[in-house]
């Protein structure tokens, strides 16, 4: 008898086929295109209902992984009693798992069985009593959502989309701040041109405008909160002899409005930078410890997500961000770039020009390991100790290349007990005793003996190596001589064969001439 195992969102259905060889007949399977034919061919033998949505999720995951659950095993015990029974399943992995149970029936899972399952699932509500189409759809939708959540294992702390958006906004803010600061300096420069030369910081420049207003107020304005004492005196003295033109109150209001925008943008940028730093430490702590928050965030944003970056090899991470230069180099057959976004990492910046490529390669290899630890490790440590330990290795490599100590990271020691500082014991000189001369002689002899033994061993080893070299050389010479002799013989034989052939040809020609005459 043929049985068909069908998995539904409601439970396991075991259908009994009226034709025991239906899975062998392609014409019969093709005819299963109406409700009447399907219900005529298959009857429900047993239906094992899932107890809850959680149970349905467990059973579905077991089937995907090719495992046999207790419910399914219990259900298959009924078929075991039917001798010469055939069980048709849709999944080959599931079929192999059922075969391992050692039940008294054969399991079939091939292309024809897939067509059979497709026909059954199309008219499944008609085959299962007590289940209508809408209820089955609702169960399927709920199970699909549960499986989706189970596979994704969603966690708000691990959403790398926040990093991608934050670093993009940070770059936009930097551009806006630079543009606004340039406009502000050009605008206020007509009134107080000397201020831009003395104050290079854009935020401090904007705060001075908001506090002081026109330059004539400089003498009565307290700028100690913004500038150090020396810089404050320079600004006040420059304001008295400034060559700038006068501006109206309306001009000053508009300049102050722009200065307020600069100060607000700078404050928001700082807050966004802190937010990005905290998100990077939560999502990729080891990458952050290795390359820094900004470089790490740019790498994640460039690849799209932390997972896709973790799956990339070290060679890809090394040149990430230099794609244009790479393809240009490949097209023109020039040298490919040695680094991309990693160029801005502090470790690469510390290296000299000739060593930047080497350090970028080492850093990319370590970053690939740190990324996989952050993204794919089951039981990971969010403290970033692994990243710090890897960074020390890169720093030691950099120090070796540069020829000077460039290590800045303290060595990471895990789970070490606190150090108890105790007073060191003083040296007791009274406990010293003079040693006899005989003892010293014995000690010198015992020290000389191992040295002599080492020397003898080294001499023996050197002699053996020399002998081996001589033997190899002699053997090589003999082989060369044999090869020369063989080549001479082969040449001689070829020459003799050629001469014989020429003589024979001449003889044949003479005989032909005689015959013609």
Swiss-Prot record:
Chain ranges passing through the membrane: none
Q: In UniProt terms, what function does this protein have?
A: Required for pre-18S rRNA processing. May bind microtubules.
**Where does the record place a coiled coil?**
456-517
GO molecular function terms attached to this record:
snoRNA binding; snRNA binding
**Principal location class:** nucleus
Basic residues: compositionally biased ranges: 454-475, 489-517
Q: Which family does it belong to?
A: Belongs to the NOP5/NOP56 family.
Top-level division of the source organism's lineage? Eukaryota
Q: Which GO terms describe its cellular component?
A: box C/D methylation guide snoRNP complex; nucleolus; small-subunit processome
- Residues forming the Nop domain are 283-403
Keyword Ribonucleoprotein in the entry? The reply is: yes
Annotated spans, Disordered: 423-517
Q: Where is the composition biased (Acidic residues)?
A: 438-448
Q: Name one GO biological process term.
A: endonucleolytic cleavage to generate mature 5'-end of SSU-rRNA from (SSU-rRNA, 5.8S rRNA, LSU-rRNA)
* UniProt entry keywords in alphabetical sequence: Coiled coil, Nucleus, Ribonucleoprotein, Ribosome biogenesis, rRNA processing
Name-wise, this protein is Nucleolar protein 58
Instruction: State where the protein is found.
Output: Nucleus, Nucleolus
Q: Which Pfam families does the record match to this protein?
A: Nop, NOP5NT
């Amino acid at each position: 008898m043929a049985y068909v195992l069908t998995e539904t969102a409601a439970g396991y259905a075991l259908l009994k086929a009226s034709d025991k060889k239906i899975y062998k007949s392609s014409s019969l399977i093709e005819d299963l295109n109406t409700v009447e034919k399907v219900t005529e061919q298959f009857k429900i033998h047993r239906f094992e209902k899932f107890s809850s949505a959680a149970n349905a999720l467990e059973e579905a995951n077991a089937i995907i992984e090719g495992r046999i659950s207790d419910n399914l095993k219990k259900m298959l015990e009924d078929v075991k009693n039917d001798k010469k029974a055939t069980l048709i399943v849709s999944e080959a992995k599931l079929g192999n798992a059922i075969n391992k149970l050692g039940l008294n029936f054969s399991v079939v899972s091939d292309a024809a069985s897939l067509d059979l399952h497709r026909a059954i699932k199309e008219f499944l509500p008609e085959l299962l009593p007590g289940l209508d189409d809408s209820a089955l759809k609702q169960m399927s939708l709920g199970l699909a959502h549960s499986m989706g959540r189970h596979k994704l294992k969603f966690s708000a702390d691990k959403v790398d989309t926040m990093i991608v958006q934050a670093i993009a906004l940070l770059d936009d803010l930097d551009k806006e701040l630079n543009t606004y600061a340039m406009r502000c300096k050009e605008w206020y420069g007509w009134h107080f041109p000397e201020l831009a030369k003395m104050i290079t910081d854009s935020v401090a420049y904007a705060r001075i405008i908001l506090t002081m207003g026109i330059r004539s107020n400089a003498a009565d304005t307290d700028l100690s909160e913004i500038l150090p004492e020396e810089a404050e005196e320079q600004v006040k003295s420059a304001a008295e002899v400034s060559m700038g033109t006068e501006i109206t109150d309306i001009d000053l209001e508009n300049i102050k409005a722009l200065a307020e925008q600069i100060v607000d943008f700078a404050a928001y940028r700082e807050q966004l930078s802190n937010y990005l730093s905290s998100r990077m430490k939560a999502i990729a702590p080891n990458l952050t410890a290795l390359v820094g928050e900004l470089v790490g965030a740019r790498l994640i944003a460039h690849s799209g997500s932390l997972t896709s970056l973790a799956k990339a090899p070290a060679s890809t991470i090394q040149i990430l961000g230099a794609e244009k230069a790479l393809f240009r180099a490949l097209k023109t057959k020039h040298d490919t770039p040695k680094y991309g976004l990693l160029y801005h990492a502090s470790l690469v910046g510390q290296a000299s020009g000739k060593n930047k490529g080497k350090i970028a390669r080492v850093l990319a290899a370590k970053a690939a390991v740190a990324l996989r630890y952050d993204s794919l490790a089951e039981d990971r440590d969010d403290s970033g100790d692994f990243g710090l330990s890897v960074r020390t290795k890169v720093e030691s490599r950099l120090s070796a290349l540069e020829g000077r100590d460039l290590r800045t990271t303290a060595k990471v020691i895990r789970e070490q007990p606190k150090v108890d500082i105790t007073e060191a014991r003083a040296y007791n000189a009274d406990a010293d005793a003079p040693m006899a001369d005989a003892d010293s002689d014995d000690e010198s002899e015992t020290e000389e003996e191992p040295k002599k033994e080492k020397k003898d061993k080294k001499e023996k080893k050197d002699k053996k190596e020399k002998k081996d070299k001589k033997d190899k050389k002699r053997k090589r010479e003999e082989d060369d001589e044999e090869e020369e002799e063989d080549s001479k013989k082969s040449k001689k034989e070829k020459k003799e064969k050629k001469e014989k052939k020429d003589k024979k040809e001449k003889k044949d020609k003479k005989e032909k001439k005689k015959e013609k005459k």
